Structure formats: C-alpha cells, structure tokens
Amino acid sequence: MRRHLSLVLGSLVIGLALLIAPGASWAYPFWAQQNYDSPREATGKIVCANCHIAKKLTQAEVPQSVLPDSVFTASVKVPYEEGIKEIGADGSEVQLQVGAVVMLPDGFTLAPQDRWTDEIKEETEGVYFTQYSDEQPNILLVGPIPGDQNQEIVFPVLSPDPATDSNIHFGKYQIHVGGNRGRGQVYPTGEKSNNTVFTAPAEGKVASIDAGDNGASVVTIQAADGTSTSETIPVGPQLLVNVGDSVAAGDAITNDPNVGGFGQVDAEIVLQNPVRIYGLLAFFAAVAIAQIMLVLKKRQIEKVQAAEGNF
C-alpha cells in the first residue's frame, strides 16, 4: 500500500513538473526507485539503461584503499561535448541534465556533512544527494542537475569500521557506478519518448502525413494489400519521409535527436586494516635497519682488513 501511495504521489509531482517546465531535460532516478528494489539487475546491468538505451562513456575514480571510519571521495565523470543541447519534452532545445548512481559496498554510506573538508564542500556545492531507499543507505543518487556545471560529480563517502560493526570485514570490495547525460529514449511504461528515432511499422508507401495533437505528426503507411498502419511522431524528431515514399518495415522515418546516453563502470576499493599497515611499516623499518647494520659491519671488516695489511 505504501509503495502504491508513493508511486501515485511521485507521478503527481512529475506531472506538475512537466506542466510547469515542459522544456526541461529530465533524467528522473525516481522511476528506478519506484520500479526496482535494486538499481542493479542480476546480470550486472544498472536499470537506468532500460530507459536510457544510448550508450556513452562514464568514468569513476576512487581511492585504491581506505582506512576504517574515514571520509573519502568517489568521483563520477559524465563527459559530453560542451554547448550541446537536446530535444526537450515540448520539442524545444534544452540544456542536458546529468545524473549518477553509486552502489557502495554494505556499510559504506554518505559522509555526514560535519566531516566534510572545505575542499569537499566546494566540490559538492549545489549537489543534492539521496539514498536509493531507507534500507539501502549504501546506494547514492544524484540528479538531475545541470550538466554544463557538473560533468564531474563528487560523492563524499564514509567508510565503515569493523571494530564497531561485526558484519563488516577488511578486504577488497566492488563499487558499481552509473552515469547519465540527457533524457531517455523509452519511458518505464514501454512507450517511446520524443528523444529517439521512429521507424516504419510496416512495409508500404507513405499514404499521408497528418497533424496530430500537441504538434505531433501521424504518418500513415499503406501496404500492398491495401491495409493501413499509422505511427504517431511526437514533436521533436524530424521526419525523413514524404507522402508517396516507399518504406520497408523498420526503416527510420525520423532522424535520431538523441545526443545523450548512459554508461556504467565498476571500481574496486580495499578497506585496509591499519594493523597491517603498522606491521608493514615495522617490516620496512626492520629491513632498513638490517641494511644499515650490514653496511656498518662491512666497513668494520674493511677497516680490520686494511689494518692487518699494514703489518
């Protein structure tokens, strides 16, 4: 019941947002939160890719190792060509929005703000972080936010301490990262957005191109047997066909207006036991002392040999 209520309220919020700002370039993580218990499927695919079909590069930078109960940053880069714009929901050109999801290992969470350094505060200015769910504080989301200012998104992370949580162990862990720029090509309902290419539903000739609702175009294709099939093209994509053109099923009848895309990448991080570090430092110190002693002993022997040679 609670899940359905959240879905209804969320849908109302999105509907109002689209009415108020129809030209915005939305990339809602809301859909993933409402439709999937986890943002990562058993196959390893992050579910954002179900709507953001186009693939683009995403990069992640994390420390090689961290100590328990320490604050570090995970950086997600969602690069794209500066100045580029995309088609908004109303067909107008809008700035790209970006977003990111970081799936941290269990126990790792968003660092509390009172432990952020001045550098972290500067890097995260204007960025709002949310948890995927109350039960999954290790999965962090950002977006949509303006892409022209945030092609690199920095996540402040707090590492767990095995000394205070018996479920946490020292060792190597994986971090799963997803980054997106721009709107999706498919809605969660399965319908195409106006940010994708439209194809001919059947083979035949374009019989008519009529004006539809809200600036859409209705392309009617008549097959050789006389049957007709229509495809509604929303405002945004540009038609590539004219009345009388012959098309095959699956042929593109519009351009592809999409300029964005989604990408995912995995990274590794080691939760390091400080005792091992101290032991390693002690080992290095012992080796250094042993080498110094060997050098001193060698010089002592050389002096003795030199003294014996004088007699």
UniProtKB/Swiss-Prot annotation:
Residue ranges of coiled coil: none
InterPro entries named among the record's database cross-references: Cyt-f_TM, Cyt_f, Cyt_f_lg_dom, Cyt_f_lg_dom_sf, Rudment_hybrid_motif
Cofactor needs: heme
SUPFAM superfamilies reported in the protein's UniProt record: Cytochrome f subunit of the cytochrome b6f complex, transmembrane anchor, Cytochrome f, large domain, Rudiment single hybrid motif
Cofactor note: Binds 1 heme group covalently.
Membrane topology of this protein: Single-pass membrane protein
PROSITE patterns, A to Z: CYTF
NCBIfam families: PRK02693.1
Similarity remark: Belongs to the cytochrome f family.
Subunit structure: The 4 large subunits of the cytochrome b6-f complex are cytochrome b6, subunit IV (17 kDa polypeptide, PetD), cytochrome f and the Rieske protein, while the 4 small subunits are PetG, PetL, PetM and PetN. The complex functions as a dimer.
Annotated protein name in UniProt: Cytochrome f
Gene: petA
